[in-house]
């Protein structure tokens, strides 16, 4: 069986991801961090645009954008929790709880500031 080589296109965008509101009538943009290589090429950029979340309703737009931006933390926490439950974790129960709480907080819509 032929094994496919891992390409840069198959990798996820580097964490952290963040939701950036751009005003009442505009989408919320989701940016990822740049890789080390990209940081050298684009030293003054804010990151890589990976998604635009348009307004269905003000609340759902914020919620959807926050959830999308929290994807790396949610993935990290779910992998750590799964390893812990399988008995393969190097982390303590307390560390797993911290990761899960951080992921939950990251996924919560942000309040205040711009109404987007």
Swiss-Prot record:
Species annotation: Bacillus subtilis (strain 168)
Official protein name in the record: Phage-like element PBSX protein XkdD
Origin: domain of life: Bacteria
